[in-house]
Amino acid sequence: MFARPIRALAALALVFSLAGCAIVVEPWPNHWTISTSTTVRVSAIQEFRPNLGHGASYRVGDPISFRIRTSEDGYVTLTAIDPDGSVYVFARNIPVRGGRSEIIDGPSPRQGFWIAPPTGPHVVSAHFTPGRTDGSVVFIGVRGYDRWQARIQLELRSFPRGDVAETRFTVRR
């Protein structure tokens, strides 16, 4: 008698828990009530990749650019970690327009990005903020992925919202 409703309730609870929702079941004098709540996080960065695609190979000396699409206007800072674990900023506060794909091919219109050693896998992170960063978070001297990510989060903390996206490529001779 109770097996079917209990199974249905368990299935419903599983669906909501997998969807990241909170389920509250409360007994009332003559009936049970079920309410749900959820938080939906919309990413500001909808696309981020190098011009040859995520995971592509580049030779030392090749030009490289990055395609980015955001849901709102703001600024992007690009940082990277080399195969040896060194972290660096190579573009800060690049303005982007929301709702359109843009190409970032240099820190300014007259400067481009060029592949340089060391060879091996590289990871680039785009940090989106609604306003300009002040540069107070320093990435020079930071080594290792976890410390890099902690610095990015520290930089984003000054803003009511922000987003991070990563892409990877390999550098060869």
Feature-to-residue mapping (PLM):
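Bacterial N-terminal signal peptides
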Residues: 9-20
